[in-house]
Amino acid sequence: MSMMKIGFYYINELLSRIDCTQLLKGNPGISGTAYMFGLISTQLAERDNGIEVTYFAPHAVNGSPKMHVEKVNDVVEAYRKAEATGLDYLVVKNNDANLLLEKLPPPAQSQTRIVVWCHNFLNQKELNCYSRCPLVARIINVGREQMDVYRDHAAFRKSDYIYNTVQIDQRYTDGLTPVAEREDVVTYMGCVIPSKGLHVLAEAWPEVLRKKPNAQLYVIGTGALYGGNVTLGKWGLAEPRYERYIMKYLSRDGQLLPGVHLMGIMGNEKYDILTQTKVGVPNPTGNTETFCVSAVEMQMLGIRIASKRCAGYLDTVRNGVLVRNERQLADEIVRQLDADVSPDDSPTYFAQHFAPETIIGEWERLFLKTIGKDVHLHPVLPLSNPDFEYKTLKERLRRLKLRFPWLDGLLPTVNIFVDLNWKVHSFLGKLKRRLTGDQF
């Protein structure tokens, strides 16, 4: 039986500094996307599954000895090498797929097809491109709710989802202190950039302190979490203008407020803080969240979540409350701190549902059982969370377009109007900050 040949392409210089064979022990302090590319490619190569893996990158990758590593300058060179060596599929992140499809004229015939791994939400241009391009074999989302955002677009027919995998070393998950017995510790974990929302938690923090004066806030991460040449402010937290806005709420007279701790980028030592945390606040804007590894890690350690209702959290938040408005965040954090919570099965549920064995198995099924037969891993019905972002209407449009395919080019998708509403809301927020001198 011939081997299935799969390639991965993703640029992140941090992958050259870590041992990808140790990623099963947890994220060592790199971005979630880099962590997933390193972990999935390495584990697919390690297993006896009939899959041969090649990793394309402009830098070294310390992966499995069974994984081939090819040095390339960009995604176009990666695709050309993949095609020349007879790979069946090349897995790329959506922004790299965009660059590839813009620069590389689709060949008349090609053995190597593209699997677009979407760690971000897609715009209409991307959806149109992927749905029409014969080179794109599958659009893999990292969550069911992320995929459902485009339910009424033609690209949905090429779409499927495989959740990210999350693993925490057993020494941190064994013998957890019950959350009700923990002190009033709140933790934010993620990159400190505007789209990840630390400023929303910072704005809420004075109100939290008014009601819970002894509460503590830990911030794990900086604006340099994703790598690159990033200039941080004097606190080493974020880009200077954004940092100044955040610290307006978290400092006084040039000193951190009592109980505020800026921890910087952390590896597995972050779990020493998380195991003592009562309430976790991953990205409280919900913007950009297609899955949120941080939210899952927190819940695996018994932490209650307080954040905003969004697509990614509908898939991954089981132990906590998702508010509909950012102004409700402070009150919800206080409620979660005061909650008399009985132990539940959330840590066990998450450890099983997002276990590497489960998720790697999904990737193997994708390549070995479904993609070549043009079938999907998951059924499109029944609807989950039908009240979220007009999903019931999207489903009606999907069925209508299946019946009358010529409507694809005539009827706009519902998400065009959802995005427009978000852009107006975002513009008004920026305008308000500019008028009040709080622009970042």
Residue ranges and their predicted role:
Residues 5-9, 140, 170, 177-209, ...:
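Conserved donor-binding/catalytic core segment of Leloir-type glycosyltransferases
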Residues 32-35, 271, 338-415:
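A charged, aromatic-enriched C-terminal amphipathic alpha-helix characteristic of glycosyltransferases
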Residues 79-85, 247-252, 267-277, 300:
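Short acidic alpha-helix that forms the nucleotide-activated donor recognition element
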Residues 125-130, 134-161, 166-171:
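A short, active-site helix/loop in glycosyltransferases that binds the activated sugar's phosphate group
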Residues 230-265:
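Nucleotide-activated donor-binding/catalytic signature segment of Leloir-type glycosyltransferases, i.e.
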Residues 274-290:
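Acidic donor-binding loop of glycosyltransferase active sites
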Residues 300-307:
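Short hydrophobic beta-strand element within catalytic cores of glycosyltransferases
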